[in-house]
């Protein structure tokens, strides 16, 4: 019985991190300022993917930017820090953003 309970708990926690990236972006309020195809307040995810294409440090840079915020890269409006986004969630989001073509 303990084995079944442990397996169920593991599956539930794993599915939380396997959450669809677009839903995660919505849940974390990323889509308040960003869209996939066009600039809103912040850049479109396709613009971000194009800018960082071929940059081997993109994942590290952008995970940090998602969590800590930043300014000056895409214009005068700063991106606020997002402390409610875990490092794992930020990595899922950034991987998805960088996959936009």
Language model regions located:
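Intrinsically disordered, low-complexity linker/tail regions enriched in Pro/Ser/Thr
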Residues: 3-4, 19-20
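Stable alpha-helical elements in mature extracytoplasmic
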Residues: 21, 58, 62, 89-90
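The canonical Cys-X-X-Cys-His
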Residues: 29-36, 93
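Sec/Tat signal peptide C-region and signal peptidase I cleavage site
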Residues: 14-18
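Axial heme c-ligation environment in periplasmic c-type cytochrome domains
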Residues: 41-52, 65-94
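Short sequence/structural segments immediately N-terminal
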Residues: 25-27
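Short hydrophobic/aromatic patches at helix-to-coil boundaries
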Residues: 97-101
């Amino acid at each position: 019985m303990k084995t079944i309970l442990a397996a169920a708990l593991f599956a539930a926690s794993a599915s939380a991190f396997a959450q669809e990236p677009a839903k995660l972006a919505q849940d974390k309020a990323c889509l308040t300022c960003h869209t996939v195809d066009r600039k809103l307040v912040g850049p479109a995810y396709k613009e971000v993917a194009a800018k960082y294409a071929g940059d081997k440090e993109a994942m590290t840079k952008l995970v940090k930017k998602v969590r800590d915020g930043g300014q000056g890269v895409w214009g005068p409006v700063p991106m606020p820090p997002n402390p409610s986004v875990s490092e794992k969630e930020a990595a899922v989001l950034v991987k998805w953003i960088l996959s936009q073509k």
